[in-house]
């Protein structure tokens, strides 16, 4: 019977190609809009390191101005970064399995013998545990050790993109580069690694900046007396005339993350932070109420509002648009089926059951759904390509955004799109198919 119903559907399409094409276009536009917004929303709202969500924690302490909160919109939250003195002290704790402090620096990178002109590169100054703690994948070599942190050692890890630029993707471990006037030996090259959102530093680009081009031990920042190029907050009227005064100031510019695999280690780390807070309060700092936090990745993304209200509104609008398209499709299907009511009445008079009439029209709806799904996937791909083109300015250059990387089509997305298209269209076609199946045949036979 299915093949017979398909033949009837094919004849129906040929009789009304305009209406059929209109329904397919309506479904395709609605599905395409949903694909684009759902894909981007899923990317920005996802947890890029979900498997370690309950063991990785951002460390925050409220050393801010006692007369006002760090964020007037969220007065209960401490600053998202730490001061230099607080970060370096907390790094002395042996409680975490892994711990890392970090900031963003601007570096000038060139070849060791002048064979490459200096180019600006965004650099992550961090500590050795950054790589194992965040499961950063290496293509060649690896990260540095604790001794290089203390030195600091003249070692560097390159990103996949930067290694492609400088060495054509070849194994560059052991090569030497000049970074900010100092020679650095490459000890590792990353695989392509673009966590979205960039959870470990949400202060730049709302968490959607690309990862850095190079990574060096954190202590190179104070050794070279280099100011951070990333986000920095300060308060008060303190005068800062040199680098030593800067690192001793109440300026917040360092992110800190710890890996705490057990509830006991989390409690111990928080107790360590509270004890330090009490000591500093006696010394005249931390005059605000105690507000120390260990925040896991998922909660960190929420409190920093990574998914903006605009994204949620766009998602709702896209589904509303799909609903409008489906309502229009229902109207067209109903008009089309009712126009053939005389034929349907004749079939009923000849012995066709309501169920058979229902399934005949539902198969026709399913064929339209399949065509609409296919066209919707095409529209969705075109839409995602448009988003990539819109945000692909400087995507692989200094300071580039990672928004374009979010708009990618994956097999799971295709499966969801096809399922969404088929189910929504068939659901929309149930009412017209049910209506035509319940029409009394005598009424239409008498009119002929």
Feature annotation, model-predicted:
Residues 6-18, 327-368, 438-439, 443-447:
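Intracellular coupling helices
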Residues 19-33, 315-331, 364-376, 413-417, ...:
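Alpha-helical transmembrane segments of integral membrane proteins
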Residues 38-166, 170, 179-184, 195, ...:
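Structured, solvent-exposed hinge/loop segments at the ends of secondary-structure elements
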Residues 366-438:
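Small-residue-rich transmembrane alpha-helices
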Residues 13-16, 35, 44, 58-61, ...:
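Generic structural signal for small/hydrophobic residues in well-ordered secondary structure
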Residues 1-4, 11, 15, 19, ...:
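Membrane-helix entry/capping segments
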Residues 128-143, 154-304:
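Mid-to-C-terminal secondary-structure elements
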Residues 16-50:
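Short, strongly hydrophobic transmembrane alpha-helices
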